[in-house]
Amino acid sequence: FPIPLPFCWLCRTLIKRIQAVVPKGVLLKAVAQVCHVVPLPVGGICQCLAERYIVICLNMLLDRTLPQLVCGLVLRCSS
């Protein structure tokens, strides 16, 4: 059964507020740290991919997808 609309609105609003507080630079550094943990040949590839594509992916995910995806999965909210 779907969750009432006010809860879905509250969920999306809350996630957007959290996104506003957590700078994207912090997330980029966290991804870069993961690349340092993996073995060297893969780590170099990981670092290269992170530098080129993580900004694009984070912008897309955080700005558009994340609130609707999380609230849809957790609360079964429609888009």
Swiss-Prot record:
InterPro entries: Saposin-like (IPR011001), SaposinB_dom (IPR008139). Its main location: secreted. It is found in: Secreted, Extracellular space, Surface film. One of its GO terms (biological process) is respiratory gaseous exchange by respiratory system. Residues 4-79 form the Saposin B-type domain. Keywords: Disulfide bond, Gaseous exchange, Secreted, Surface film. One of its GO terms (cellular component) is extracellular region. The keyword Methyltransferase does not apply. The keyword Metal-binding does not apply. Disulfide bonds join C8-C77, C11-C71, C35-C46. Pulmonary surfactant consists of 90% lipid and 10% protein. There are 4 surfactant-associated proteins: 2 collagenous, carbohydrate-binding glycoproteins (SP-A and SP-D) and 2 small hydrophobic proteins (SP-B and SP-C). Pulmonary surfactant-associated proteins promote alveolar stability by lowering the surface tension at the air-liquid interface in the peripheral air spaces. SP-B increases the collapse pressure of palmitic acid to nearly 70 millinewtons per meter. Homodimer; disulfide-linked. This is Pulmonary surfactant-associated protein B. The gene is SFTPB.
